[in-house]
Amino acid sequence: MDYFTEYKLSKYKEIEPLSDKGTTVLVYDTVERELLVKKVVNAEIYKIYKKINDIECDYMPKIIDTIKVEDEYIIIEEFIKGDSVDYLVKQKGAFSEEKAVSYIIDIGEALKQIHSRNIVHRDVTPNNVIIDKNDRAILLDLDIARIEYKNESRDTTLLGTAGFASPEQYGFAETDTRGDIFSMGMLLNFMLTGEVVQKKIYTKTGLYNVISKAIQIDPEKRYRRIEEFIIDVSAYCPEKIVTEKNSKLLYKIAYHLPGFRTNKIYKKIIAIILYFAFLWDIYNTIFYREVSFKE
């Protein structure tokens, strides 16, 4: 292990395991002073994280670092504080249509980014979606994801969560992005009913048709792309979605400005002071030029 890699690993102090196997651990970054998640993954999953580590999306954890130490592959990612959809539904009951659609659109935004890199998530489930303090749905866990290969006839590794995994994940065909659309239909139904489709399917509004199309056994009969699914879902809650997206516009712009990217309060305060001083200087320069011109 070289000195730089050793230094990077040394700054992450392990707090507690987040999985039974101990491969996912809550850590504290002693330099940035923030909680993060450390994962030990296999070589294939490491490749997937490398493919998405430059994605900036509000609805999935930010990849902080990818570290290879001999035969060990380590991912450091943002820690998302909140409750899972599974927990919330079991504790408080099914969501309203407005709430469910809002969350599904958030998750859809994350999947759009993932699918754009030819990656299939394969585990879109209530346990892998966290509702954060800003009431956003965050999609977690790429630990059984796969890169989409067009020439394969079926998945070589059978993985997934019963009740949400597509038939393809059980070896009937190759899993592509339509497998995630199947899971999204199952997830939407769970949010609205509190049950898996096999026990109860949502029938109150036209969302029944959206869910039914998404969860077709034959992938050819499903939505072809996640964008198509989201468009149909959005039709049942358009006003709220438009309002939310407009309200997030300034936040998204600010997120890309220096001082706001890490979401640390002290950095935001310093940035605001500096930006104000900069704008004040510009104002004074323009004002004095106008005065001089008039004289």
PLM region spans:
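ATP-binding glycine-rich loop module of kinase domains
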Residues: 11-50
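Activation segment signature within eukaryotic-like protein kinase domains
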Residues: 103-104
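Conserved C-terminal C-lobe helix
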Residues: 203-217
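Conserved short submotifs of the Hanks-type protein kinase catalytic core
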Residues: 70-84, 88
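Conserved HxN/HPN-centered segment at the entrance to the catalytic loop
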Residues: 56-65
